[in-house]
Amino acid sequence: MVEALLSGIVLGLISITSAGLFVTAYLQYRRGDQLDL
């Protein structure tokens, strides 16, 4: 049970992190050289 829970948490964090990086990279690509944080 613990191993399944830990694996689920790890996969969740990895998916969220990868999604966040993809979104930020996409927004930077759309904006170009503009840095509007």
From Swiss-Prot:
Database matches in InterPro entries: Cyt_6/f_cplx_su5, Cyt_6/f_cplx_su5_sf
SUPFAM superfamilies, per the entry: PetG subunit of the cytochrome b6f complex
Statement: the UniProt record of this protein carries the keyword Electron transport: yes
Main location: plastid
Keywords assigned: Chloroplast, Electron transport, Membrane, Photosynthesis, Plastid, Thylakoid, Transmembrane, Transmembrane helix, Transport
One Pfam family per UniProt: PetG
Signal sequence, renumbered to the chain: none
Function: Component of the cytochrome b6-f complex, which mediates electron transfer between photosystem II (PSII) and photosystem I (PSI), cyclic electron flow around PSI, and state transitions. PetG is required for either the stability or assembly of the cytochrome b6-f complex.
NCBIfam families referenced in this protein's UniProt entry, alphabetically: PRK00665.1
This protein's name: Cytochrome b6-f complex subunit 5
Classification lineage: Eukaryota, Viridiplantae, Streptophyta, Embryophyta, Tracheophyta
Name of the gene encoding the protein in the UniProt record: petG
